[in-house]
Amino acid sequence: MAATSPHLTSIPQAVRVAASIDPSIDPGLKQQAIDYLTKVKQLSEETWQDCLQLYLQGAGAPGPSTTGRDGKEKLETDMRMFCLQVVDTVLIQKPEVMGADAVQGMYEAIVEFIQVEYIGGSCEGGQGFLRNKLAFTISQLFLRAFPSHIPTFLHPFFALLSPPTSSPPNLHPQLLTIRLLLEIAQEIHDTTLKTARIMTKERQERDGVVRDVIRSSGDDKTAVQGMLGIIEKGLEQMNSGNSSDKWAEAVDATLKTLSAWIPWIDLGVALNPTTLPFYHRLLHQPILSFRTATAGIYRTLVAKGIQDPSSRLQVLRVLAPVAVIDPLETETRGGKSEEVATFRASLGVVLSAYGVALIGISDNTEVAEQLRNEAEEMMNPALPLLLRFLSDRQYEVPLSVSPFVSDLLRIYKRMYKPPNPSTKAGQAPSPPSTLPQLSPERRQFLASMLDILIRQLAWPEDTEWEAPGNEDELDEDIAAFKNFRGSCRSFIESIAQIDKSLHTEVVARIVIATLDAYASGGGAAAVPWQQAELAMHLVYTFGEVSKNSTRAAFYELPPEMATKAARNKLRAAQGSGRTTPSSSDNVDLGPSSNNDRLEYEQFPLSPLGQLLTRCMTSGISSYPHPSVTLQYFEIIVRYIEFWKAKPETLPGLFEALLDGQGIHNSDEGVRRRCFYLFSKLCKDCRNDTVEGMVSPILDSMRDMMVINAELPPTDTPDEDPLIKATTGKSYVADQLYLFEASGNLVYLTKADPAKQMALLEAVAGPLLSGLGSGVERARVDENDLQAVLQVHHHLMALGHFAKGFPIVPDKLVELLPYTGPFKQMAEALLQAIEILKRRRVVRDAARFAFSQFANAIGTPVAELVPRFVSAVVTEFEPSELVDFLLFLQLLMHRLQGSTFETMDMLLLPLLSRIFTVLQQPVTGTDEAQVHARLKDAYLAFFTSLMNENLDGIFITDRNKPEFENVLTTLFNLTQDYSDGASQRLAFGFFSRSVIAWGTSPEAAARPSVFAESAMASQSKMVSGGGTAQPNAHAVTQEQRAKQCLPGYENFIYQRLLPAAFEVPANSQFNIRGGQLIVHEAAVLVRNTVQARGQEAIDFMLSDLLRRLNCPSDIANQLIASLTTQQAKDFKKTFFDFIKAMRG
């Protein structure tokens, strides 16, 4: 007699202890139980048979703790679930430990269990989750046993598909089998489920074999016939009123399983003279869930992947989706319930699959023309039905036919869309190529589709409008509408690309009808707000079709004039040093360009210009719903070039944005959006007309510029109210746009310095007063958080006010009347930061404001930089260092040489803080992110020092003792193969360093070793003595030679130049993702030759390349490329050379 396994008693005991909620149980004992059960699962190859025995015992018992047919007690449910999990573990993760005998034994035991429990027993008390869990386990056993061990695995289960004859019916055996068939289909075919599995080649081959054998053995036919039989019986019983709920559950489950089998079984099994009429009958059942599931089956049949086009067309004819769907669409049209919408969407999916299939044939040039024509003829009757689905106001229904619409418009675009002209600047456009014209029928179809899509853009009548704000907190209905609106817009734009005139006609008709109805006296009563908002939305998006935001978009220019305008813009761009013309270039090209100035107003308005004029004259800006007026303001800002050409309209536009419809609107969301739009208007509309209105405009907006510092409630005791108040979207954050706008406006009055100073004082005075009172309160009580927040807000407002002033060249700074006031603001900022330097939010605001003051007046603030830096440099948190380094880079770029002393003073303490942080252990993802960002930031900071010709800071008396350590640290980063970003930045630093510290007097005195062909325009400037950075002051090569650092050439030859070759050639280097690193190394090589001349070439040929075992002919070719190719070409050559070195 075999010994009884101790697991048979230990597992039940452990599960009871581990699952117990009895507080008297010793926690140590409970932990022992949990540890034991964990080991049972880990050693599933040894324990699975015991677990299977425990699960199966007591079969036929009425419930847990009662005796079954085998004379044993059925165990508790949670215990049996654990046992099945162990069995699943061995089946899924360790199937190889189960031999043929074990598989056969398990199979027979489970079949016997089902016979006892589900045929003659309590069916697990009807608990569906237990039935489903067993079905999953059987499916995993099936995949282990079929077809090699047990080819008839499914036959006992097929027998269970016979409809029950008992009353009330026992459907649990059928439901178990249906679930088993579903689990099998999902395992071997369902793409969604398969993505969650580790898909090996062996697994894919196994799944393919299982599908093939099921098909070849006829098991698919048996399964489908069994499932159809259950559905048939269920419908019959439900129509008779017998156990409707039980049968409805069975039919629903069977339809779901049938849907999972049909995609991969033989078409003849799923579609034949018996099944097709059965599907038709199901589609007309009164229960919508059955109809929806059947539509899914129908869609699968329509989309079935049949390779032969002729056979596929034949199948589509047999299915006749249009004839099937048409009456169903008519019957359900107007239904508002969610179930009806879901069913209609499922019908739309069928139609869409049908259309996509036909387009796939008609658009395939490899298919015989006759078949392509047949496919197109079959598609034509589907088009009116497509439009009906598109017009449904329940979003999921029109979205269901999106693939059909997309494919249809795609082929129309290819057939009818004019190609983009490949005209070079200054040349006349080439004559348009001849394209076939849209037939009247297709144009009418597109017109109908366009009309439907445009009307679908209107807000639903049952959805309450909300002003744009935090998109993350959008109401679900509004979010769904905006998503749907975006889909419709993409289709509208596609139609416009196919036939721009059609788009213009339809949009103009709808917009003009709406504006006329409103302007004729009907007002809001005649035009619902949804219709008015739609008209404004259409005008707003109209310009997107032309892709032209210049003034030419508003006028009908003759072709020759349009070309002349383009030439004028190009001349203006070249004359101003820009490479991209701006829209203002054709307004004023300067005194020497007056002959090229184009007077647009002499030409008739384009459709967009006409629509904008109608908007302006219709009075729609006074519509009493914020959605309409806000969209009107969006139009004003988007098409500002149009209004700038009509100065007489500007006072009205500003007045509208300033009144109760705009920044004074009672709706906070509208008001906040208008703050931004008003700022944009002020920034983009700087002309004489606006200059004359500055004073009244500022007077009108002054009450909106009162800053209220309100501390928000915190959600947890640890939450910092200051951080919460200053992050994310807030009212004050939007209010700051008004201060930027006021800066733009005050600057416009530059022709009258006295007036400008008065207006500047009117804006900045209250801000400085509020700043001062907040600082004083915080000085008296350092825990007064509201005072701290007040200081933050006023500093940010001052910064945004300064942001409204343009960056002025240093040579003009002395002429600025506002230099003194801004310097006073900077002084006030310093007083604030010296008192509140320990507050993170104040430091953040102070950095922003100070950088804006530096932009506005330049070098006069340079003398204040040391004081500012001294106040804050010791206070930074590790995460704040990154922002501080970016701040210093901004100052260096704006103030350039004026920051040398500050950076000299700052370098060592800054390096100390940086490396202290980087040397701390990384204990989590937050620290890892801080380390990565800080490393990138300090490397970018070092590079900026080099770019701004501040390289001398590294070798001052103060910093020179640490210079070697800095070089060593950076050099080590070039060897760090785990951090490609740092490698690239380190190589970039060294490529600049060889010019700064390694230029030899001999190379500077001799002719360049580079051939003329190697000189791009920038390279020629460099070879003549300039630096490689276009934004830095030019430093001649002779000056560089005088600054040459003795001994640095040794570092170049011994460390840097070898690293440029060896690092990317190393096997640890990721060559695929490291192309930019190799390019930086190539720049290092090239700059070394530039700095050292022939000496560097001789070193590479006679020493370095030989040590790298580079053949002499290859080495000579590399040097020849180096001295004759431009930098961008040599980067590619060097990359190819490195790849060859790696083999």
Swiss-Prot record:
Superkingdom of the source species: Eukaryota
GO cellular component, one term: nuclear pore
Protein name: Exportin-T
Role: tRNA nucleus export receptor which facilitates tRNA translocation across the nuclear pore complex. Involved in pre-tRNA splicing, probably by affecting the interaction of pre-tRNA with splicing endonuclease.
GO molecular function, one term: tRNA binding
Subcellular location: Nucleus; Cytoplasm
Gene: LOS1
UniProt cross-references to InterPro entries, sorted A to Z: ARM-like, ARM-type_fold, Exportin-1/Importin-b-like, Exportin-T_C, XPOT
One Pfam family here: Xpo1
